Structures are given as C-alpha cells and as structure tokens.
Amino acid sequence: MAPKVFYISDGTAITAEVFGHAVLSQFPLEFESLTIPFVETLAKAENVKRQINDCFITTGERPLVFHSIVKPEIRDIIYSSEGLDYDFLNTFVAPLEQHLGVSASPVLHRTHGKANHGYEARIDAINFAMDNDDGQTMKHMDQADLILLGVSRCGKTPSSLYLSMQFGIKAANYPFTEDDMDNLKLPEALKRNKKKLFGLTIDPVRLHEIRQSRMENSRYSSLKQCRLEVKEVEMMFKRERIPYIDTTNHSVEEIATKILDVTGLERHMF
C-alpha cells in the first residue's frame, strides 16, 4: 500500500507541495497524496484533523503531513492529529529569529497574495505567454524577455508558461514546422530580437513517441519526419549561433532552470 501524504496550508499549499515533493523524491516509492489549501478556520482545521485520523485508522500507518501554516491556533490542531508532522515554517522561522534578532510577524498570504509586487508581473507574463504561444502573432516579440524556438512538441509551450507563472518572465515561443524544412530560416521579427532567442531540441525517438500519442501513424509523427526536423533545426541553431538545450527526459522545472542559467535572465518574482 502506498504511503499516504497530506499537503496542508492556510494559503495555496504551493510551498508545502514544493518542499514535500522535493523531500519525497529522494525515496524510490509511490505516494498517495492529498492537497488541502486554505485551511483558514478552526472548523476547517478540525475537519482536516479528522481526515488525517481516519486515514490512520483505515491504514494502520501514520500519514505524512507536510504543512506551511501561519496561524498558530490552526497549526496546533494539525499537530494534535495522528499524522507525522513536517512543519516547514516553524523549522526555519525559529532559527532565523535567533540569527536575525527579530521576531517573525506572520501575515497570511503575504507571499502569494495580491499585495505582493510580483503578482502583477506574474499575471502580465502569463497573459503574454498565452497571447504569443506557438507563433500566433509576431507583433509583440519586441516586448518579450525570451523567445523559445524549436520543433512542434519539444516543450516550448509548457516551458513558456512555467517561466511566466513562476518567475514573471514574458516568454514567447515560435515553432518550426514541416513546411519550413525546405528553406529553414529565421523570420524577420525573430532576427530583430536575436539576443532573446533560445532553442529547445529533443531526441527524435522521444519526439516520435510524443507525436504518436497525438496523431498516430501520420507523416507528422513518423520517426523519419521527426529525425529530419530535429536535424534541420539543430543545424540552424548552430548556424545562427542560437543557444539551445536538449529537453529529452527533463521536467519543465529542470528545463526552465537551465534556460535561466544559460541566459542569465533575472527573475521578476521572489
């Protein structure tokens, strides 16, 4: 039976999930997880406690409980459950208070709330990424922080959206298609913004597998076509001196981090 995991917060639970996933990824096990955000009242906390206790009674194993709860009274209720508690905020806050000589003054949603100056940057960047996805328009390339290039289904769209959501980076993306292969070159709008260009490539066999799941037994998904497109686009990257990385078997988080590392782009959030 897969170990049970709870991610709990009086906010979005993003912090609890990120830290929890980072810790649990060190173990070669499959986990069954439940995320419970916005536990902002005593009644909600008591309900979560019942869920944790019911899980313990049903399985006979104490579930893992990762939480980032600001309010002490909410946190105390979770502490009193039958779960194994991993409290990220308290783990780091107490030592920091001692080191900084300042008492923490917790404010709910300070990190992810609208009052945060990064909120508007996030929304603007997300809208930009969606409006400039997959070469829909070339009118706004001058406003982009980054323009991702590559063949269809190599990871451009998820990478653009992740960069916008996590870091407030305005990322456009442009695909090179089968029709481009006979005379592959950069459109004028991309040439004008060459310093913003960054390429993504992928192993042709993996690309074939991805495309097969979308358009099985088509020319678009054939291994021959995948090999041709990847080869031609990589040659163009080298010819135009466009930096690029291989996305094969990498998560979108890893791809985004590599892009930031290579380009030196500054995060607009955090």
Swiss-Prot record:
Keywords: Kinase, Nucleotide-binding, Serine/threonine-protein kinase, Transferase. Pfam families: Kinase-PPPase (PF03618). It catalyses: [pyruvate, water dikinase] + ADP = [pyruvate, water dikinase]-phosphate + AMP + H(+); [pyruvate, water dikinase]-phosphate + phosphate + H(+) = [pyruvate, water dikinase] + diphosphate. Its EC number is 2.7.11.33, 2.7.4.28. The keyword Kinase applies. ADP binds at residues 150-157. One of its GO terms (molecular function) is protein serine/threonine kinase activity. Bifunctional serine/threonine kinase and phosphorylase involved in the regulation of the phosphoenolpyruvate synthase (PEPS) by catalyzing its phosphorylation/dephosphorylation. Belongs to the pyruvate, phosphate/water dikinase regulatory protein family. PSRP subfamily. HAMAP family: PSRP. This is Putative phosphoenolpyruvate synthase regulatory protein. It comes from Shewanella sp. (strain ANA-3). The lineage of its organism: Bacteria, Pseudomonadati, Pseudomonadota, Gammaproteobacteria, Alteromonadales.
